[in-house]
Amino acid sequence: MKKHLITLIGTFLICVPVFAQQTGSISGKVTGPDGDALPGVTVEAKGDVLPRPRTAITSETGAYRFQLLPPGNYELSFRLDGLGPQSKELRVLLQQNSSVDVKMQLESISEEVSVVAEIPLIDVTSTEIKASIDSEVIEQLPVGQEYRDLVKLIPGVQYSEEETRGPSAGGSGQDNVYLFDGVNVGLPLFGTLSAEPSSHDIAQVSIIKGGAKAVDFNRSGGFTIDSVSRSGTDRYRGEVSYQIQTDGMTGNRDTESDAEFERDRDWSVVNFGGPLVSENLYFYASYYRPTTTRDNRSNLYGAVPDSESTRDEIFGKLTFTPSNSILINGSYRDSDTDESGNSVTAEDRNGTASVGDDATLKILTLDGSWVATENSYLSFKFTDFQNETSSQPDNLLNFPIRSDGTVQLDVNNLDRQGTFSVPQPIAGEDAFNAFIAPLIGRYGFIENGVATGGGVTGVGSTISLNDFNRESFQLAYDHQLGAHDLHFGYQNSSDEEDLARTSNGWGSITVLGGRSTVPDGTPIFYEARFEQQSLEDVAGTISPVINSELQSQSIEINDNIKLNNWTFNIGIVASNDELFGQGLRENSSNLSGFELAPGNTYKMYEVDFDEMIQPRLGATWSPNGVDSVFASVARYYPAASSLPRAASWARNLRRSIRGFFDAQGNLIGVDPVRSSSGKFFQEGLTPRSIDEYIIGYSKQVNSRWTLKTHARYRYGQNFWEDTNNNARSRFEAPAPISQADYIPNLSDFRDEIGGSSYVIAELDDAFTKYYEAGVEADWRGSNSYFKGSYVWSHYYGNFDQDNSTTSNDANVFIGSSFIADGAGRQLWNNRYGNLRGDRRHQLKLYGYYNFNWNGSAGAYAVYQSGQPWEAWDVEVYRRFTGSSSDTSRFAEPAGSRTTSDHYQIDLNYTHNFKIGGRYNIQVAADVFNALDRQTGYNIQNKVNSANFGSSRSFFDPRRFQLAVKFQF
């Protein structure tokens, strides 16, 4: 009842002016010849991306304001009878306010003059750690072609070349929020960046690292990056470009890996925009086609199939102003990606295990704003995100599998049974070593003339269909009342996933060699891990798809109060999350509250509004309008969670299963993976949260120089994970941690409806801490720009979402990872220490200079500390488990070791060949990693696997890119 009441109140508030996500604003004060405030002045704002101009009248205090302006170039004109007219040109930035003050002169001594307004480069009323970057900066710097490439410009955010997981900036790489035209393009339920809109479509970028207000529903546990796409303007403009990077333009890969290939890449872009109906309707359209090929591939296993990736993406946008006070934007993006020969990038993986992928992405947005009065504004946004993906091995096996023992594992052809992990000898295990010797001889790779274990051969293990959807609707109402800027907002969103996953043959196969037994004492020699959806029933059918859903609501109220030299921000965000799975139905007569109902959608858990109240408090003091001291306190409840799938009861019918075989390949037992099934929730869970404290100082030294410095502290707590119900007693949790089960009567629940011995629990004393001290400086000249930043930080704790498995550059379950998954993976098992995202020192410098010969030069430089890592070894926990897996079993404190520091310099030169006043041919050359610093990271840290301590990934070598653009 409480939830519905809050929702109704929020809806009422907004239906009765927010800084809409995709807009900026202009404000200022007009004075007369004597310096006194000048009321009644007509101020008009004309923009190249705003079809119709807007007007405002200055108040009794001479103040004026334009809200909800699309970012772009504007001209302000000021007129009052008896005084000379004035006009000023300026650029409105995304989520930024531009302040323009004007002093008007008597008409008899003044003539209209248009000048470029000197805009303050810092917002002395804001406590946010934020920055805006427009297309002029992006185009003149050595920045890549994808949305992800822009992240490297953010101060204090680690430079990363990982392709899936986001970089860290005081939180998990899965807690960042990525917005494009206000659309959350993060992968539903996982929080990684799933969409890669072309940077050519981006007009401006805005980044908020901390100190967020209760505006735009910011729940990010990391950073939030938003961008606004290009729009049509009052002139027809277009561009055709082609960019290339051949293998010959790429330096030799100076790595420790024996994986070799020749990679060619190119990017094609076409865009065009302009007015459809003058002063009413503008359009913009683009086509983007990046391709990547890897030829002549080889590794320790020999030749590897060539791989290819091709993407075709179209984008269209309309900007409509039916009246001077109404602005409507609509856009649609459609992308199709086809990839073949993937997944074989490691040196020790046979090319026969390659996989092909296909993905489609569709994004629809509709947003609008209405300037109801000079002091009140209403805005709305609707977004629809659809990402359909599929993946299947390039080599498919054609035999069915069963769990009744009628289908054997063909031990004489293990490379035709699934993905086979070749074992390695273990010191002192003579019987085991003798058993695996012929397997290494047949399936191992040859190194120095000797067959060697530790590699992977066979075929790809899994066939997957994975579709993601997100719908979101939000409303916002802003009102200026004296010294108060009031904001009210409501958001409703739904994240969905549909998953069908089957195994190719027996899936993934490992060798236990008789070191473990089934309950009756029979030795296990082989273990296969396969998907239950692969198993046929007596009718020859398999389980249907798993549907998972997360529904969220948020209400926000914010008041920005200006009192003399002080600005206070008081805000609150209240959120409600509902997690839905499949396979159960509510039944109050049962102790568990549920009954089995295959295919039925049920609410597995709810976090109510009163459990996720997020205060946003801040204060700034600016004694002179150019210096500002600020402080803020905020709490964030990150929205991303994988539990709607990971804990769904449907996983009991569609879970991962371990099959155990004897030396001849006879199935002697099966054991559903306990963490891969439906789970109950511990009672009284507190949602995970991030508390943040900031103090800072900013100063506009002069019209060109700005300086910012801050200190920030973040504390993460109340982390949820799936874990053994009896983990605390079974794996000897230290005092003062309780030895009790998380759910004392779990066995009674399971007697009714089954389920896992694992539960979703709030892990005892789980935490992260992040300390940061940073300084930034900006310099803007008439033909140049420079930005420098240095950040010291320390990120540590005992819960590392970024370091839970072997391949962390992936969509890892949030709330159901390897953390706390059985023996050796509990938080008291060496997990306290430096986290994977810790980068103690980071320096970034970038800028550009425009020459007087139609050329420009840009540069980007970064230095950062290395990546923490530690050894993993199951033998440390041998008395607790018979497993052979080192994965996520820390043999020493987290982050005990660190890779080498990384630094690199990227360069750009651009030259324009102007043809008349309308056309331009632009040639641009980029050099990335000019010093060819190929630092290794992503260490192979499994003690019992080949090449312990060696780097599995390296920063890309020196590479050149050449682009030609025809602009008109």
Predicted features along the sequence, with ranges:
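Solvent-exposed loop/turn elements at secondary-structure boundaries
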Residues: 406, 433, 442-453, 583-614, ...
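C-terminal beta-signal and adjacent terminal beta-strands/loops
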Residues: 704, 854-885, 899-906, 910-968
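Periplasmic N-terminal accessory/gating domains of Gram-negative outer-membrane beta-barrel systems
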Residues: 59, 82-84, 88-105, 110-231, ...
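Transmembrane beta-barrel strands of outer-membrane/channel proteins
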Residues: 117, 240-246, 285-289, 330-334, ...
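Gram-negative outer-membrane beta-barrel transporters
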Residues: 577, 704, 708-870
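Short, acidic Ser/Thr/Gly-rich low-complexity loop/linker segments typical of extracellular
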Residues: 48-63
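Transmembrane beta-barrel wall of Gram-negative outer-membrane proteins
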Residues: 237, 260-338, 355-384, 573, ...
